[in-house]
Amino acid sequence: MVSRMGWGGRRRRLGRWGDLGPGSVPLLPMPLPPPPPPSCRGPGGGRISIFSLSPAPHTRSSPSSFSPPTAGPPCSVLQGTGASQSCHSALPIPATPPTQAQPAMTPASASPSWGSHSTPPLAPATPTPSQQCPQDSPGLRVGPLIPEQDYERLEDCDPEGSQDSPIHGEEQQPLLHVPEGLRGSWHHIQNLDSFFTKIYSYHQRNGFACILLEDVFQLGQFIFIVTFTTFLLRCVDYNVLFANQPSNHTRPGPFHSKVTLSDAILPSAQCAERIRSSPLLVLLLVLAAGFWLVQLLRSVCNLFSYWDIQVFYREALHIPPEELSSVPWAEVQSRLLALQRSGGLCVQPRPLTELDIHHRILRYTNYQVALANKGLLPARCPLPWGGSAAFLSRGLALNVDLLLFRGPFSLFRGGWELPHAYKRSDQRGALAARWGRTVLLLAALNLALSPLVLAWQVLHVFYSHVELLRREPGALGARGWSRLARLQLRHFNELPHELRARLARAYRPAAAFLRTAAPPAPLRTLLARQLVFFAGALFAALLVLTVYDEDVLAVEHVLTAMTALGVTATVARSFIPEEQCQGRAPQLLLQTALAHMHYLPEEPGPGGRDRAYRQMAQLLQYRAVSLLEELLSPLLTPLFLLFWFRPRALEIIDFFHHFTVDVAGVGDICSFALMDVKRHGHPQWLSAGQTEASLSQRAEDGKTELSLMRFSLAHPLWRPPGHSSKFLGHLWGRVQQDAAAWGATSARGPSTPGVLSNCTSPLPEAFLANLFVHPLLPPRDLSPTAPCPAAATASLLASISRIAQDPSSVSPGGTGGQKLAQLPELASAEMSLHVIYLHQLHQQQQQQEPWGEAAASILSRPCSSPSQPPSPDEEKPSWSSDGSSPASSPRQQWGTQKARNLFPGGFQVTTDTQKEPDRASCTD
């Protein structure tokens, strides 16, 4: 039944993106009459994979470790790198456990068990002592990628000895087992990334019916734009429409001078003749028809896949289409995990976790977030008056996606594995040159297609926004989150709906901050008031005349003048400060926005407010600016490809070389997506003493720490790895310590009881809204002896954490469903307080740096000891193999002072003056 999404019974076919890789998922086929059993090749002819059977690290399974094949249920045998064929044999369970790890098989009719079930793993292997990492969680296994590279990959970690990693250079074939009742519909899934992505997209797009209608309407909208534009160009007699010449009235009746629409429309034969007389128009129509057919085929294929996803939701997850809108994504994810734990869905030999699902859905998105964190995205253009302007239009983002991930000549080529050539440091120059030629080719293609794309952009904007502009002229003056904001403010492993919800909560305080913190411009305000007065007076006069006699509208350009005057008055009114925002403190508004944005575009110092305003204005920009960027995108995209991305080809290749890790069962992912504080933590974000990251390996702006904290709060059942778990424990211990210090000191004001007592509503959002009335951010004139304002936040954080851990205290008297529905709101409120608390500690440490490194280290850990020599990671070159000394990082070139020591033309070599300030050892 199902042969879509790369699924297809016993047919030998390649996956959607090519050969089967670590994401391929063979399903147990339907029982068939057993043909003559083919010879199942041993170690020399391909790895035998049964129920995701994988050999021990750096070893191969020998035929002697298996029992002789006997007649029984069919089993799936995978050979080579992905070609699959059926081998009808069975491996019985040994009667006596051997001394070595032996694979245990169950009959095909029974669902295999994993994790905590009684059935042992099929191919357990204990790693060598050099590969064991007792501090890491057994749920996260990361394999070595390139042993000779500068950036240390996360090694194979298998502390319990119950799992094994695939052989280096050999793909792992995880198995998807479906219960007996579903085997008629689910045969073979070859692309788990597409499978999980479509499961998420099906939920977010509200089911199959909405997806079908959305695709139909999009195809119909394309046809309408093309046909209606052609009709306006070739089928309308504008001389008759504008009454420049009399029309030929053929209808019977009295002659009248008014022109009707039918008089201006040409006959169909004449219209077709005028269309055929323009070869350019015919060529454009043919191209449009070809593009529409491609979109139609793509939509049909996707609809077949989504129909299968609907069957999976209904039969496997027990979520019918009519209940989909009332089921949150967290519930869908929990049912997926429960299905895998029960044996109904085995996509890998170890238990599936929330992080595995996010890694597959957000494989490429995490790379983009890391590129933005390292200053390679978005593209920036220097301004003549100083500073720079970021540019990331939809067209440029599509080109970047084609260059890096999904294009035919991209790095990933739409798959889950980075080619091995990019993992070798000796080919970086050749790969960078080849990628630079690809960028040049794509830029030339963009330049050739720019007239067509520009015409399409103009038509789409015209049809979409002109009516809105006439009805609501101030709509273009409204602000919205830019594409830059959605990239820079995004956490690692954050799904799109989570980002949208967070930015929606931050919109109102951020917009109010921009209105309040705008630099004073009395002359501009005075001119705007006068312009509003004169434009409004003229508009009022024309409006009164129109009401008195509607024939005034027949006067030439009267309606045009009224529209222009209304737009002018609305635009001028936007430059007048609102009176209700005059008395509000910008610091409180910025703090409220920070609680939901999680990243603060701010620099300490006397000019911090102006810089914060400019950077916030780039994140929350006017709609008119966004439309202008999209209109200019066809012309600017080739220039940015040539002058921004092509000169940075070597840096981008090095980025993927150093920040790609191979996770067993998942494939190649960005190392930042693991949220490993030890590898990518920053000492100024409470990870001092716990991170070994050099300057080039650190994630800027506390992205690793904040992403880890958000993910752990959003998924309470997820077990983080050892170093990340240690950081979370250290953070909570610091919160408890500061909360106890605040409660024990009676000299401080009772802000915590006041906030809690003033909040009359038990709902978390009401508590959080009441909390932001009190200033929590540290003052600008902080001194080393000033009282720590983070202690007040820690006290509040400890209080709300106790509420979150005790669901009975949420909405007392409410039903169980209401209490469960409020738990995500409590997690959001707790995350907001954690963000404020970490930013307070970070600002204190930044402002105390002039008084010495010792004072800065005290804020991040309770004790310190004499400094020790820098680690080898700091002495070796960061990312660079040529030993060159670059000038500065891309983030530093464009005015952002937080990021330092990166890579514009080679990569930064850590010198003595650039070593970490906090390298002292500390025992808790």
Swiss-Prot record:
Residue ranges, Cytoplasmic side: 1-207, 298-438, 460-526, 573-624, 646-924
Residue intervals passing through the bilayer: 208-228, 277-297, 527-547, 552-572
Induction / repression: By hypoxia, leading to inhibit NOS3 expression.
Biased composition (Low complexity): 17-27, 98-113, 878-890
Keyword Membrane: yes
Renumbered ranges of motif Tyrosine-based sorting signal: 151-154
Compositionally biased residues, Polar residues: 78-88
Renumbered residue ranges of the record's region Disordered: 1-144, 847-924
Catalytic activity: a 1,2-diacyl-sn-glycero-3-phosphocholine(in) = a 1,2-diacyl-sn-glycero-3-phosphocholine(out); a 1,2-diacyl-sn-glycero-3-phospho-L-serine(in) = a 1,2-diacyl-sn-glycero-3-phospho-L-serine(out); a 1,2-diacyl-sn-glycero-3-phosphoethanolamine(in) = a 1,2-diacyl-sn-glycero-3-phosphoethanolamine(out)
Comp. bias regions, Pro residues: 28-40
Main location: membrane
GO biological process, one term: reticulophagy
Location of this chain's protein in the cell: Preautophagosomal structure membrane
Keyword Transport attached: yes
Biased composition (Basic and acidic residues): 913-924
UniProt record similarity statement: Belongs to the ATG9 family.
Additional note from the record: ATG9B gene is located on the opposite DNA strand of the NOS3 gene at chromosome 7q36. The genes are oriented in a tail-to-tail configuration and the mRNAs encoding ATG9B and NOS3 are complementary for 662 nucleotides. ATG9B transcription may a role in NOS3 transcription regulation.
Full protein name: Autophagy-related protein 9B
